[in-house]
């Protein structure tokens, strides 16, 4: 859950990007389904949920860091209710979007995303089965909340097979440093942005 105040931080960050009214309206479609708590964040957003603002900020960061052209095969570890998939699709026409999550969460994501016309195929996985040739790997908090054995499985089966990685951790600097040290074996690592919203958590 994202608080009203956290939503204000995301809204402020989003203003660094150039977005028009049509794009904002397409982002706000997220709130049509599921009875989201929406609040007035003023211009240019109007009434929008804090959770959608977080997804918008994530999607715009991904677009800024990695571009929108070469993201045909996207993987998300821990897909929430499917909101980030929907939001990214406002910016990027992907071919495949794989979501790894628990079975109950996968059913929720399928139901939510069925209300929208998503460009590309959304594929759900309830086990960390191996996947190759991933253009972009995303994890907002979920990876850092896994136990060590599951982290190993996800890293070896999925993360290291990814060309680009966008990951936010919520277990503080130790978790972040452990992951970065490991990633240096398989990636040319550059930390593009460090957001410390709620010390000592919330590192990107």
Where do the PLM segments sit?
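Conserved Class I S-adenosyl-L-methionine-dependent methyltransferase catalytic core
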Residues: 1-69
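Conserved SAM-binding loop of SAM-dependent methyltransferases across substrates and taxa
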Residues: 81-92
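A short SAM/SAH-binding and catalytic strip from SAM-dependent methyltransferases
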Residues: 137-149
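Conserved class I S-adenosyl-L-methionine
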Residues: 70-80
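Conserved beta-strand signature within the Rossmann-like core of class I S-adenosyl-L-methionine
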Residues: 162-173
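A short, conserved alpha-helix within the catalytic core of class I
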Residues: 146-158
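S-adenosyl-L-methionine
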Residues: 111-131
């Amino acid at each position: 859950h994202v608080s009203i105040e956290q939503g204000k931080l995301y809204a402020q960050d989003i203003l660094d990007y150039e977005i028009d009214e049509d794009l904002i309206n397409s982002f706000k479609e997220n709130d049509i389904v599921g009875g989201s708590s929406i609040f007035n964040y003023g211009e240019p957003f109007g009434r929008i949920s804090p959770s959608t603002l977080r997804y918008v900020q994530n999607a715009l960061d991904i677009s800024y860091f990695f571009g929108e052209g070469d993201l045909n095969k996207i993987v998300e570890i821990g897909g929430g209710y499917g909101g980030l998939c929907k939001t990214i699709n406002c910016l990027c026409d992907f071919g495949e979007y794989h979501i790894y999550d628990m079975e109950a969460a996968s059913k929720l994501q399928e139901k939510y995303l069925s209300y929208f016309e998503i460009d590309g195929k959304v594929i759900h996985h309830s086990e960390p089965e191996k996947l190759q040739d991933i253009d972009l790997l995303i994890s907002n908090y979920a990876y850092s909340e896994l136990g060590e054995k599951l982290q190993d499985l996800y890293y070896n089966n999925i993360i290291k097979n990814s060309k680009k990685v966008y990951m936010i951790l919520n277990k503080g600097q130790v978790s972040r440093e452990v992951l970065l040290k490991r990633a240096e074996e398989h990636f040319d690592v550059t930390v593009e942005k460090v957001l410390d919203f709620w010390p000592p958590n919330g590192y990107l």
